Amino acid sequence: VQAGSWGPDCALLGGPAVPPFVGAYDIFTNNNADLYELIERTQIEGSWPIDHPLPLPRWSCKSKNCYQLESLTHFENLAAKIELHVQKLLEEHNYNTVGNFIDLYQNFKKSGCCNFFKYFQSYAPPITPAHHTCVGLALELWNRLHHLELSFPGISQHLCLVSCEENIEALSEYTALSERLDTAAYDLEKEHVLLCLKFKINERQGLLLCDPGYHVSRVVTIMQDRAYPNTGWFIQSEENNICKEYNYQFSPLNDKFVEWNERTTRNGIQETFTGLIYVAHPYLTAVDVTERRNLVYNFRSLLSRDQKGHLIAGVYFKVKENCDEFTIFYQDMGKQRMKMKFSTLNEPFQVKEKALNIITICNEQLNLPEGSLLDILLQVGDLMRDKSYLRQLLDVNQSINIMSANN
């Protein structure tokens, strides 16, 4: 196949052309064929150097043009419609990094392969509606926004995924990478993605960002001039004496990046973190790099949200050796939270009766089919007891952490 034969959306910044991403076709049904088509059209496979823990991230060589809006009112109308879709998405789709974690394990065991890293290199990360991480949620939102075409012609073609690296310490060094992404890609893990729209209101330029993966229920607007409708700081969540605030702004060091500032206040003590979102070019390897990276991350969660992004119910746990513990939470006259052990679920009924009642309540509030959450937890328990598999998976995670440690 000749380079460049996939058109401008698949042209690469900092690397040779490679085919569009076609992994895991069989997981799609007619009901989500549009989502598959979107992935096929906008995603590719990155090249994978020998002994590197991840494929290399890739971006389109062409920037997206700004979507032209006639007035502030025109923009406000668009933002309000997108926000409704974001809120509906949060309510209808759980955030789920557990399902694909289990699928990877079960497929590995069926394969008969003993070397996890070799299998990991050949594995096509599936994107399914039941197992959406930040990647699937951003793609699902993009897919839904084609419904706005009647009111906002061409809007779908102006949307794109953008890549994010979290908790950056060396901001000036990182923002300088935009001029040499071809070599810098070796040190990037790109663990998060958002949906982005560049726009102009008359001659005023701005960005619209949507982040359903971090439960952000609003449309975030970032104006070059920082004037209205720039969003600025907002409270993302406030619970149990913990207040989390977000701010998104063009980086003063390099406007090809947006700084994502997070300010967390616990009992009066404040912590700050900064992530960097590369917005100059569409991100083409969200599935092959970001979703793949997520598969071996050492923290998993399955969460339901309301339209405002508030967490309703769920489970979460650390992935580490000799760990038998998970946390479950649900609503019952306020939020209830407790720790349980995976091993408890294999005990006689009398021992685990209380745990089963709580799991049933949580199952309902996650909107899962009856008995599904218990099945999921039993499968995770089996995985966590497989010491050889767990050790190999955590070794890959550690290799990725070492690779990106200097960012």
For each predicted feature, which ranges?
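Short, solvent-exposed loop/turn segments that connect beta-strands within catalytic domains
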Residues: 152-154, 200-206
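Short acidic (Asp/Glu) patches
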Residues: 171-183, 188-192
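Short, surface-exposed beta-edge/turn micro-motifs
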Residues: 191-192, 205-207
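Short beta-strand scaffold segments in enzyme catalytic cores
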Residues: 193-197
